[in-house]
């Protein structure tokens, strides 16, 4: 189960670039053809074969499911896969060294040194892949809510180079192991027979194990993808329900504010009318008094003008 999980987690890296690579021109990947040439049935080689199969499957997943993979658990599972792969590779190397006793010590030391270097390169490639995933997850979280198209394109370019380098180093490691086996044949026929007797059951066991993993891997992964899809749909529905509830609350608050504003406007109108009536009660007596005074003044002026206009009596009479 750990190998299955780890294979899915590693292959997700290429799945992140599926959307970007659909836009650019499709180019043939020669590494897939090389893969078929060097696979000979060893356990670590079969694991790499499943890696490429899962790679194509993960590319069919939706972006939502791919984003679900961007979690700390993914990094932990990927680290577990790397440790398990290197452990099996070291165990296989130890078995070969035990069976190569007829080979000269100098030849064994040289072959062992070359094999360790190839093994270290393969481990560094896997660590680089894990580091790219961690870096990508951090950048995606930092760019939350923004466009990640440029980030996906850059990651796609890095992952393509890493896939080629990983396959190249795995091919080199397979060749080193082949040299080990050739050295056993050159050493003694007895050693070769012992190696074949030991490796035969291991190869068959690896093939059976790979077939079992391949038959059981598809269904759990599909069920997990469906479960993720259902979780995403449930989250979307929950967010929609919360949004609707929030809109209803906002509408109620707006209605309350409107009612308060109308009430305050009515109060202001009443206060204005009361103030107007008060002003009228203050100034009406003054206006009436001024009107009376003005009328009296007009009457006096008219009376004065009438008196001055009367004729003066003549002295002749």
UniProtKB/Swiss-Prot annotation:
Annotated stretches, region: 8 X 22 AA approximate tandem repeats: 80-255
Gene Ontology cellular component list: chylomicron; chylomicron remnant; endoplasmic reticulum; extracellular exosome; extracellular matrix; extracellular space; extracellular vesicle; glutamatergic synapse
Specificity for association with VLDL: region residues: 278-290
Region (Lipid-binding and lipoprotein association): 210-290
Modified residues (Methionine sulfoxide): 143
Sequence repeats: 80-101, 102-123, 124-145, 146-167, 168-189, 190-211, 212-233, 234-255
GO MF annotation terms: amyloid-beta binding; antioxidant activity; cholesterol transfer activity; enzyme binding; heparan sulfate proteoglycan binding; heparin binding; identical protein binding; lipoprotein particle binding
Record-listed heparin binding positions: 162-165, 229-236
Homooligomerization: annotated span: 266-317
Localization, UniProt: Secreted; Secreted, Extracellular space; Secreted, Extracellular space, Extracellular matrix; Extracellular vesicle
Region annotation (LDL and other lipoprotein receptors binding) ranges: 158-168
Keyword Iron: no
Annotated Gene3D superfamilies: Apolipoprotein (1.20.120.20)
Gene Ontology biological process terms from the UniProt entry: acylglycerol homeostasis; AMPA glutamate receptor clustering; amyloid precursor protein metabolic process; artery morphogenesis; cellular response to lipoprotein particle stimulus; cholesterol catabolic process; cholesterol efflux; cholesterol homeostasis
Subcellular location, principal: secreted
Keyword annotations of the record: Chylomicron, Endosome, Extracellular matrix, Glycoprotein, HDL, Heparin-binding, Lipid transport, Lipid-binding, Oxidation, Phosphoprotein, Repeat, Secreted, Signal, Transport, VLDL
Residues carrying Phosphoserine: 147
Subunit structure as annotated in this protein's UniProt entry: Homotetramer. May interact with ABCA1; functionally associated with ABCA1 in the biogenesis of HDLs. May interact with APP/A4 amyloid-beta peptide; the interaction is extremely stable in vitro but its physiological significance is unclear. May interact with MAPT. May interact with MAP2. In the cerebrospinal fluid, interacts with secreted SORL1. Interacts with PMEL; this allows the loading of PMEL luminal fragment on ILVs to induce fibril nucleation.
Function: APOE is an apolipoprotein, a protein associating with lipid particles, that mainly functions in lipoprotein-mediated lipid transport between organs via the plasma and interstitial fluids. APOE is a core component of plasma lipoproteins and is involved in their production, conversion and clearance. Apolipoproteins are amphipathic molecules that interact both with lipids of the lipoprotein particle core and the aqueous environment of the plasma.
Name this protein carries in UniProt: Apolipoprotein E
